[in-house]
Amino acid sequence: MALKTFNPTTPSQRQLVIVDRSSLYKGKPVKALTEGLTKSGGRNNLGRITARFIGGGHKRSYRLVDFKRRKFDIEGTVERIEYDPNRTAFIALVTYSDGEQAYIIAPQRLAAGDKVIASEKAVDVKPGNTMPLQYIPVGSIIHNVEMKPGKGGQIARSAGSYAQLVGRDQGMAILRLNSGEQRLVSGVCLASIGAVSNPDHANINDGKAGRTVWRGKRPHNRGVVMNPVDHPHGGGEGRTSGGRHPVTPWGKPTKGKRTRSNKSTDKMIMRSRHQRKK
């Protein structure tokens, strides 16, 4: 996919850079594979804001994407590649030989008419195919990787992302993630071949605040421009720097403060993403 720039007929057009989606399917999604999606505006069941700066945005229907890929040894044909407003990656509509249809995350270089298959045994190493990590060749680029067998893919699902299988050790697979982290995952966990589609997502520029609002994101106010009643960084005469290390509106350290506390899975991380990049 290429990027699209525009003739600056307005100030916001001058900055606007979007992904050219002209090659994607232009119709509606398969209705049987969609659900209704109600906007929360960042409010919980009491009507209180639990996630700030969320609201508005275009109406969406939720596409049911198959992250588990547990339809084994039945070949599927890619009908088309579609846009999905609920994620940064594109999705592919797959029709299996028994007539069932499903949406999967579309990897790069997957096109309409291609065949894909998922198996518990070794299959061809080509984009969109899924198999256990123990059968994937070392060095392969993979996405939609499970962390627990049968739970469905959790690692490398957003646009342009991927993990690399760098080795094996006692039934475990060693993965290198985009963050620089190296971690162990069980060899029986499934993973799909290839990198996720739409790598140009990283280069888009909305050009104006309104386009960000169309996505459901409201203006993000810094604490340093608030009053003391609203934020620990608020107040002061004139422009101030906050006067303390960065904290959240509730006084907890932020901006680089590490919050991970899952001791039981520390042993799965061989190399932290925080270690100096060699």
Swiss-Prot record:
Keywords: Ribonucleoprotein, Ribosomal protein, RNA-binding, rRNA-binding. PROSITE patterns: RIBOSOMAL_L2. Residues 218-278 are annotated as: Disordered. Gene3D superfamilies: 2.30.30.30, Nucleic acid-binding proteins, Ribosomal protein L2, domain 3. GO terms for cellular component: large ribosomal subunit. The keyword Magnesium does not apply. The keyword Ligase does not apply. GO terms for biological process: cytoplasmic translation. It comes from the Bacteria. GO terms for molecular function: rRNA binding; structural constituent of ribosome; transferase activity. SMART domains: Ribosomal_L2, Ribosomal_L2_C. InterPro entries: NA-bd_OB-fold, Rib_uL2_dom2, Ribosomal_uL2, Ribosomal_uL2_bac/org-type, Ribosomal_uL2_C, Ribosomal_uL2_CS, Ribosomal_uL2_dom3, Ribosomal_uL2_RNA-bd_dom. Part of the 50S ribosomal subunit. Forms a bridge to the 30S subunit in the 70S ribosome. Belongs to the universal ribosomal protein uL2 family. NCBIfam families: rplB_bact. HAMAP family: Ribosomal_uL2_B (MF_01320_B). One of the primary rRNA binding proteins. Required for association of the 30S and 50S subunits to form the 70S ribosome, for tRNA binding and peptide bond formation. It has been suggested to have peptidyltransferase activity; this is somewhat controversial. Makes several contacts with the 16S rRNA in the 70S ribosome. PANTHER family: LARGE RIBOSOMAL SUBUNIT PROTEIN UL2M, RIBOSOMAL PROTEIN L2. This is Large ribosomal subunit protein uL2. It comes from Rhizobium etli (strain ATCC 51251 / DSM 11541 / JCM 21823 / NBRC 15573 / CFN 42).
